């Protein structure tokens, strides 16, 4: 008989943890005592319409501040500023960068993200068909092309935490295949986390799933 106790499966180490988070927007309570662990690799946040998927991404990005609760990065308490510094997130509805070109937008991110990968960006520009749009002001781009600009920035950023809302929306087939490939790479990372919000899991990707329901997060 072995002297060693039977091995037990251990949960992945959390890169980011949310504890007892309460978020209210106006008269609407979005989350009540929400607890969540985000491990390195790929995580899907899913749920019904208006369940809080986008709001959760904004919380994790430090773009929203909850009424109560706490966040921890690598086990260390993290305020909104720390979350912003660790993450890449862009609100796809924002017009804040509409007057500059995609190329200028990407160039401005290189100083913010020390692990910015210029070669990855070059590959993404080709894979997403952005070469002909790179020097146009963003307001001239279609919704799908603007989304590609954000996606290229996300995957090239080298951020510890990448947050993407509906990564396949408004994409052509070739671009969707490119995004799927990059998400597949993100799923294998042992040091970075990619969190996507969508209505269902993309086929063929190894990921963890978190269901949002009635203000709570449930591991699926």
Task: Identify the residue ranges that each predicted region occupies.
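A short, flexible loop at the N-terminus of ABC-type nucleotide-binding domains that lies
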Residues: 2-40
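The short alpha-helix immediately C-terminal to the Walker A/P-loop
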Residues: 47, 55-59, 208
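ABC ATPase nucleotide-binding domain signature region
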Residues: 61-111, 201-202
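Conserved ABC ATPase "signature" region
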Residues: 118-133
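Conserved ABC ATPase signature
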Residues: 137-144
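Hydrophobic anchor residue at the start of the ABC signature
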Residues: 151
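ABC-family nucleotide-binding domains
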Residues: 165, 171-172, 176
């Amino acid at each position: 008989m072995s002297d060693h106790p039977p091995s037990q499966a251990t949960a992945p180490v959390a890169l980011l943890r949310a504890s007892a988070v309460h978020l209210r927007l106006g008269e609407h309570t979005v989350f009540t005592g929400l607890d969540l662990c985000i491990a390195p690799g790929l995580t899907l946040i899913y749920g019904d319409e208006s369940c809080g998927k986008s709001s959760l991404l904004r919380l994790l990005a430090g773009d929203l501040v909850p009424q109560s609760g706490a966040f921890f990065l690598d086990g260390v308490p993290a305020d909104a500023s720390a979350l912003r510094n660790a993450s890449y997130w862009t609100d796809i509805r924002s017009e804040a960068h509409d007057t500059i070109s995609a190329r200028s937008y990407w160039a401005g991110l290189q100083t913010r993200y020390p692990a910015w990968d210029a070669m990855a960006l070059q590959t993404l520009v080709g894979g997403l068909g952005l070469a002909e749009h790179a020097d146009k002001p963003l307001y001239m781009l279609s919704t799908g092309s603007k989304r590609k600009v954000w996606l290229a920035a996300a995957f090239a950023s080298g951020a510890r935490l990448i947050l993407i809302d509906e990564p396949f929306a408004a994409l052509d087939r070739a671009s969707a295949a490119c995004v799927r490939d990059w998400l597949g790479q993100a799923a294998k990372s042992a040091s970075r986390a990619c969190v996507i919000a969508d209505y269902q899991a993309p086929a063929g990707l190894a990921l963890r799933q978190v269901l949002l329901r009635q203000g709570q997060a449930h591991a699926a």
